[in-house]
UniProtKB/Swiss-Prot annotation:
Function: Dermonecrotic toxins cleave the phosphodiester linkage between the phosphate and headgroup of certain phospholipids (sphingolipid and lysolipid substrates), forming an alcohol (often choline) and a cyclic phosphate. This toxin acts on sphingomyelin (SM). It may also act on ceramide phosphoethanolamine (CPE), lysophosphatidylcholine (LPC) and lysophosphatidylethanolamine (LPE), but not on lysophosphatidylserine (LPS), and lysophosphatidylglycerol (LPG). It acts by transphosphatidylation, releasing exclusively cyclic phosphate products as second products.
Protein name: Dermonecrotic toxin StSicTox-betaIF1
Record's keyword terms, sorted: Cytolysis, Dermonecrotic toxin, Disulfide bond, Hemolysis, Lipid degradation, Lipid metabolism, Lyase, Magnesium, Metal-binding, Secreted, Toxin
Organism: Sicarius terrosus
Active site: H5, H41
Any GO CC annotation of this UniProt entry: extracellular region
Organism phylogeny: Eukaryota, Metazoa, Ecdysozoa, Arthropoda, Chelicerata
Positions annotated to bind Mg(2+): E25, D27, D85
Stated family: Belongs to the arthropod phospholipase D family. Class II subfamily.
Family matches, as InterPro entries: PLC-like_Pdiesterase_TIM-brl (IPR017946)
GO biological process per UniProt: killing of cells of another organism; lipid catabolic process
Length: 272
């Protein structure tokens, strides 16, 4: 899985899909009441990137709906996965719950409005386990509106590099036991040790654990991308998706890996 990083306007969507990404990471901002409004990161962000690109979430979801709907004139077969990086850190408890309601509503109104013909999977990436009220709000709206059929398109991630055992406990409290990706990473401006990443991969491959997939971010250097692949990650988030495509086209990486397609289930743990 190749996720283009910080893809927050329509021009960048086209850019990363053209570069070979089969996934996009978008930043979702909320107002103080927890209403999802824009795809926007803001300053600071990754080095050598424009931090201020943005569009309204409704416009964005309408566009990617077209790109991921077979038969649409704008359909792009390789785009199958979208990570929503949820900017929740300024929200209070009730606003966190409202934010979950809001994302469920936005997906229903603008992405699944053709009764689910659009086929992308969404990973809802919450920073901290203390923000689990977002997930409860999302679940509440799904229950209220009878949207359970769309759960097959939804996965979960806690992205702030917290203790993995604490994350497991949070999922247990939320009654979530599948569709779980575990991220590990840091801005491309800095380097990060790989102890936690290795631990996540070990737990993914251990019976009884909660992790289905592991991805690393933001990896831009060829050496860093190759090292993550050698460790056994399922996905890489990068500002240079074409570099990963190039790596996967050569030598041992071509023999060991391939780019995921829509036929691959993002919620299943891969077994060689």
């Amino acid at each position: 899985w190749i996720m283009g990083h910080m893809v927050n306007d329509l021009e960048m969507v086209d850019y990363y899909v053209d570069k070979g990404a089969n996934g996009l990471e978008i930043d979702i901002t909320f107002n103080s009441n927890g209403i999802a409004e824009y795809t926007y990161h803001g300053v600071p962000c990754d080095c050598f990137r424009n931090c201020r690109r943005n569009t309204t979430l409704s416009t964005y979801l309408n566009y990617v709906r077209q790109l991921t709907t077979p038969g649409d004139q704008k359909f792009r077969q390789n785009l199958i996965f979208i990570i929503m990086d949820l900017k929740l850190n300024r929200l209070k408890s009730q606003a966190l719950f409202n934010a979950g309601l809001s994302i469920a509503d936005r997906l229903t109104q603008y992405y699944w409005k053709d009764d689910g013909k659009a086929r992308a999977y969404f990973l809802l990436s919450v920073p901290y386990v203390r923000q689990a009220a977002f997930i409860r709000g999302f679940q509440s709206r799904f229950e209220e509106k009878g949207l359970k059929k769309y759960y097959e398109k939804i996965g979960w991630d806690f992205s702030a590099n917290e203790d993995l055992n604490r994350i497991r406990e949070a999922y247990q409290k939320l009654n979530i036991s599948g569709h779980i990706w575990q991220s590990d990473g840091i801005t491309n401006c800095l380097t990060r040790r790989t102890r936690r990443l290795k631990e996540a991969i070990r737990k993914r491959d251990s019976p009884g654990w909660y992790i289905n997939k592991v991805y690393s971010w933001s990896l831009d250097r060829y050496k860093s991308i190759k090292y993550a692949l050698d460790l056994g990650v399922d996905g890489v988030m990068s500002n240079y998706a074409d570099r990963l495509v190039k790596i996967l086209s050569k030598g041992t990486y071509k023999r060991r890996f391939r780019l995921a397609t829509h036929e691959d289930n993002p919620w299943e743990t891969f077994t060689p």
